[in-house]
Amino acid sequence: MEPSWILLAAGLVLVLLVVAWVLRSRARRAATSVPPAAPPGRVVAPGERLRRGLAATRQRLTAPLESVFGRAGGDVERTLGELEEVLVGADVGVATAGALVARVRERVPSGAEASAVRRAVREEMCELLAGTPAPAPSSKPWVVLVMGVNGVGKTTTIGKLAALHRQSGRRVLLVAADTFRAAASDQLAVWAERVGADLVRQRPGSDPAAVVFDGLQAAKARAIDVVLVDTAGRLHTRTNLMEELRKLRRVIAREVPGAPHETLLVLDATTGQNAVAQARTFSEAATVTGVVLTKLDGTARGGVAIAVRREIGAPLQYVGLGEGVEDLRPFDARDFVDALFGGEADA
């Protein structure tokens, strides 16, 4: 009997070692998706950070705009025609560029100098992009539903939003309702540990609505201030996606009257006009209250922000300008336009 017990104990130890190794490997894989904290150094002002993030887009616009606005004389129609072509080339989109130019045409008299047209363009962009900032939580729990296709940085954005709320002293709970992608749950777990947030998740393949229900029950029991709900991003199954989002919203509204208080759509700026198509599809499935535009620092397609705003009407509320936690910034229309054009408004 004694040898049998020894073998049994050895086998049990081996199993435990294997399980520990698997869990550690999964945690390491998830951790690679979490950006590092900013290195020590001087604090970069939000406007400067945005200017750096839009450098590629600005570089793409600078030479064509100088050609358009640097000309002497008052041929407004020629200036506007060339301006429209430049805007389309910056991923503002054909329809949005045309509408923007039409509004500028109404603001400037015929024979106006190119500098006057430039000022009018800036003002029209500011007015188009202006919107309400993300609201401060005013009830408890404050529920935020976050949508977006896989690969846009949705789960990372949720982690960074959690960090922002934690910096404001709020208790945060993350709900891993993207049960079709195991890595999403693991990644949220790493973020929860990193920023000091609670986490509710179930095994892969679970019913997302059940996960949300459990999360809201936990939020009420633990006196959580903010609940951030991750969702699946399977845009290729459009009908199922819409129905799933509607179901999640019904569960949320039933458990927390008036919720979701925010419905954020995360879009990847590097995808250009594809981001506009995604925005259109998601806005059909749920009312979008705000847009998060990620990866602005890695693309020359920053003009897509203007196209998305006009397409679905929802305000841009955050922009992603890098990998660090501090690189998710509240959106400011004036700062954005200044960064896009490369300086303060013309005198």
Predicted segment positions?
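Feature marks short, highly hydrophobic, charge-poor N-terminal signal-anchor/signal peptide-like helices
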Residues: 1-12
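Short beta-alpha junctions and helix-cap segments that line functional grooves
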Residues: 3, 19-20, 161, 277-279, ...
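Cytosolic-side junction of a single-pass transmembrane alpha-helix
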Residues: 16-31
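Short juxtamembrane segments adjacent to a transmembrane helix
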Residues: 27-52
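Short beta-strand and adjacent tight-turn residues that come in two discontinuous sequence segments
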Residues: 33, 229, 293
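Primarily NTPase-proximal linker/entry elements flanking Walker-type ATP/GTP-binding cores
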Residues: 43-229, 244, 254
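Conserved catalytic-core segment of NTP-binding enzymes
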Residues: 187, 204-222, 236-345
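Short glycine-rich anion-binding loops that position phosphate/pyrophosphate groups of nucleotides
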Residues: 232-234
